[in-house]
Amino acid sequence: MIKSELVQIVAARNPHLYHRDVENIVNAVLDEITDALAAGNRVELRGFGAFSVKNRPSRSGRNPRTGDSVFVEEKWVPFFKTGKELRERLNPGMNDNNNGEDD
C-alpha cells in the first residue's frame, strides 16, 4: 500500500470528510512522526508498534563493484518494533510468549 491508497481508504471510510482533508491529516501525522524521530524521540502507537531511531556505528565496509575497503560513517537509522496487537493479527492462533519484550 502506498500513501495515496491509504488516503483513499480512509476517505472512503469517512465520507463526511473531504478527500483533501484526509490527505492533509495523513500528511500531518507522518510529518509529526518524522519530526519526533528527527528530534531523537520515540513514537509509540499502542497496539500497532513503536518507531525509534538507533545508532549504527561507523565501520569498515566493501565497495561491491571493486571490492575495495571503504569507511562507512556512523549514522542514525529508523527502527520499528511491532506492537502486541499487530503481531497477534499477523499470526492468528499463535501463542505469543512475549519473547522477553515489554509492550
Swiss-Prot record:
GO terms for cellular component: chromosome; cytosol. Heterodimer of an alpha and a beta chain. Keywords: DNA recombination, DNA-binding, Transcription, Transcription regulation, Translation regulation. It comes from Rhizobium meliloti (strain 1021). GO terms for molecular function: DNA binding; structural constituent of chromatin. PANTHER family: DNA-BINDING PROTEIN HU, INTEGRATION HOST FACTOR SUBUNIT BETA. It comes from the Bacteria. Belongs to the bacterial histone-like protein family. NCBIfam families: hip, PRK00199.1. The gene is ihfB. GO terms for biological process: DNA recombination; regulation of DNA-templated transcription; regulation of translation. This is Integration host factor subunit beta. This protein is one of the two subunits of integration host factor, a specific DNA-binding protein that functions in genetic recombination as well as in transcriptional and translational control. It holds the Pfam family Bac_DNA_binding. SUPFAM superfamilies: IHF-like DNA-binding proteins. The lineage of its organism: Bacteria, Pseudomonadati, Pseudomonadota, Alphaproteobacteria, Hyphomicrobiales. The keyword Ubl conjugation does not apply.
